[in-house]
């Protein structure tokens, strides 16, 4: 009985520390490969969008995004990658990274697009090879700016 009480307190403490345990759930894009990265010491679980179908879908349709979750879009070569907020249900930050994984452009607190025909396409003036979508406010909370190097761990997890 005492063991169960101690165990419950430990479990509750772990759940409160979202950086350790509270990913959306095993259902956070189960069909996607995943990777974990560290951004300024903060661990983030990323679903990898590496096919055209996955890149088109992005985070659309997801109900929410926890602070320690995001999506990494992988492209074969650097180019000007445009993104929009069609069918999104929450605001996000978008970071464009070059082939050296340095942030080259940031769009913050992008709101969902309500009217399909009026959706703005966000396209930086510089080429990028990777694009990160993270919870709105993440870039400010973790002091990310142009030139920040994101250590991408492209060894995939399932």
Briefly describe each language-model feature range.
Residues 1-5:
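Bacterial N-terminal signal peptides
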Residues 13-158:
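Compact, glycine-rich, soluble single-domain proteins
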Residues 9-11:
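Sec/Tat signal peptide C-region and signal peptidase I cleavage site
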